[in-house]
């Protein structure tokens, strides 16, 4: 049901209302809500009913019952009257308004972690990181340079690397000497000055293998003087 703001029912919200039912019972409570069927919700409600005596000589007595929250059916409702103004909300906590003046308290964060007054612990000297600005690249490296400057620096670095002699660590000697064709092996004396070194075996014959031409293999007697040895394989002997 659509209810306008000027409805009388809305004007009596939160009032203390007296509701009389068909059976004569009276409900007095704080009016909170209603609907199109006139079903009512009363808060802090009390019920009053009259009890008839058994004898006619005795007067009627009224009985009170504390009910609390009550839902009244509209079909049993006879009348509604105002019992009193809305009660004052004393002792009920409300959210303070944005423009309200602040109290004497001080707003602080919840107590978690380390208090604000306690100094932060410092790391040991050996485990602390580098100081800001120390240990990074030099200022010349970080300064932006043009294309020509970068190319010249790269060329100079390449030339210095190509022309610089190789540095050997101390205590390990210099580079090995160049091995010539006639250089003697380590531990042997070379030929005197002015003489050519002896020639080694030919490149095709490995040293220590094979025998010179005309020499019999080991274990065989040489032929007698005036006789030739056997012809090499694949050749016919000469005719007499």
Curated annotation (Swiss-Prot):
UniProt main location, coarse: cytoplasm
Sequence repeats: 175-181, 191-196, 216-221, 222-228, 230-236
Pfam families per the UniProt record, alphabetical: LSM
Gene Ontology MF term list: histone pre-mRNA DCP binding; RNA binding; snRNP binding; telomerase RNA binding; U1 snRNP binding; U2 snRNP binding
Compartments where located: Cytoplasm, Cytosol; Nucleus
SMART domains linked: Sm
Residue ranges with Pro residues bias: 172-205, 214-240
Consequence of changing residue 55 to S: In CCMS; expression of the protein is reduced
Modification Asymmetric dimethylarginine, positions: 108, 112
Domain Sm: 4-86
Gene Ontology annotations for the cellular component aspect, listed alphabetically: catalytic step 2 spliceosome; cytoplasm; cytosol; histone pre-mRNA 3'end processing complex; methylosome; nucleoplasm; nucleus; small nuclear ribonucleoprotein complex
Record PTM Omega-N-methylarginine, positions in chain: 108, 112, 147, 172
Annotated region (Repeat-rich region), positions in chain: 175-236
Residues recorded as bearing Dimethylated arginine in the entry: 108, 112
GO process annotations (BP): 7-methylguanosine cap hypermethylation; mRNA splicing, via spliceosome; protein methylation; RNA splicing; spliceosomal snRNP assembly; U2-type prespliceosome assembly
Region named Disordered: 163-240
Keywords: Cytoplasm, Disease variant, Intellectual disability, Methylation, mRNA processing, mRNA splicing, Nucleus, Repeat, Ribonucleoprotein, RNA-binding, Spliceosome
PTM statement from Swiss-Prot or TrEMBL: Methylated by PRMT5. Arg-108 and Arg-112 are dimethylated, probably to asymmetric dimethylarginine.
Quaternary organization: Core component of the spliceosomal U1, U2, U4 and U5 small nuclear ribonucleoproteins (snRNPs), the building blocks of the spliceosome. Most spliceosomal snRNPs contain a common set of Sm proteins, SNRPB, SNRPD1, SNRPD2, SNRPD3, SNRPE, SNRPF and SNRPG that assemble in a heptameric protein ring on the Sm site of the small nuclear RNA to form the core snRNP. Component of the U1 snRNP. The U1 snRNP is composed of the U1 snRNA and the 7 core Sm proteins SNRPB, SNRPD1, SNRPD2, SNRPD3, SNRPE, SNRPF and SNRPG, and at least three U1 snRNP-specific proteins SNRNP70/U1-70K, SNRPA/U1-A and SNRPC/U1-C.
Family to which the UniProt record says this protein belongs: Belongs to the snRNP SmB/SmN family.
Further details from the record: Patients with the autoimmune disease systemic lupus erythematosus (SLE) have autoantibodies directed against some of the individual snRNP polypeptides. The most common autoantigen is called Sm. B/b' bear Sm epitopes.
Known function: Plays a role in pre-mRNA splicing as a core component of the spliceosomal U1, U2, U4 and U5 small nuclear ribonucleoproteins (snRNPs), the building blocks of the spliceosome. Component of both the pre-catalytic spliceosome B complex and activated spliceosome C complexes. As a component of the minor spliceosome, involved in the splicing of U12-type introns in pre-mRNAs. As part of the U7 snRNP it is involved in histone pre-mRNA 3'-end processing.
Disease: Cerebrocostomandibular syndrome: A syndrome characterized by severe micrognathia, rib defects ranging from a few dorsal rib segments to complete absence of ossification, and intellectual disability.
Designated name of the protein: Small nuclear ribonucleoprotein-associated proteins B and B'
Natural source organism: Homo sapiens (Human)
Gene it is expressed from: SNRPB
């Amino acid at each position: 049901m659509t209810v306008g703001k000027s409805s009388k029912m809305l004007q009596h919200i939160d009032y203390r209302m007296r509701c009389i039912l068909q059976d004569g019972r009276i409900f007095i409570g704080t009016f909170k809500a209603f609907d199109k069927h006139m079903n009512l919700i009363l808060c802090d409600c009390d019920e009053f009913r009259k009890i008839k005596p058994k004898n006619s000589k005795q007067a009627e007595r009224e009985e009170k019952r504390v009910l609390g929250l009550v839902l009244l059916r509209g079909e049993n409702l006879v009348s509604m009257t105002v019992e009193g103004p809305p009660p004052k909300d004393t002792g009920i906590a409300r959210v303070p308004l944005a423009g309200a003046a602040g109290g004497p308290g001080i707003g602080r964060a919840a107590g978690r972690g380390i208090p604000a007054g306690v100094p932060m612990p410092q790391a040991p000297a050996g485990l602390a990181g580098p100081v800001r600005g120390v240990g990074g690249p030099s200022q010349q490296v970080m300064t932006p340079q043009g294309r020509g400057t970068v190319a010249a620096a790269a060329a100079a670095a390449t030339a210095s690397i190509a022309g610089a002699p190789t540095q050997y660590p101390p205590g390990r000697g210099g580079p090995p000497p160049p091995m010539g064709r006639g250089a003697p092996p380590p531990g042997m004396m070379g030929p005197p000055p002015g003489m050519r070194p002896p020639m080694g075996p030919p490149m095709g014959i490995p040293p220590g293998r094979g025998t010179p031409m005309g020499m019999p293999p080991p274990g065989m007697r040489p032929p007698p003087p005036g006789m030739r040895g056997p012809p090499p394989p694949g050749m016919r002997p000469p005719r007499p």
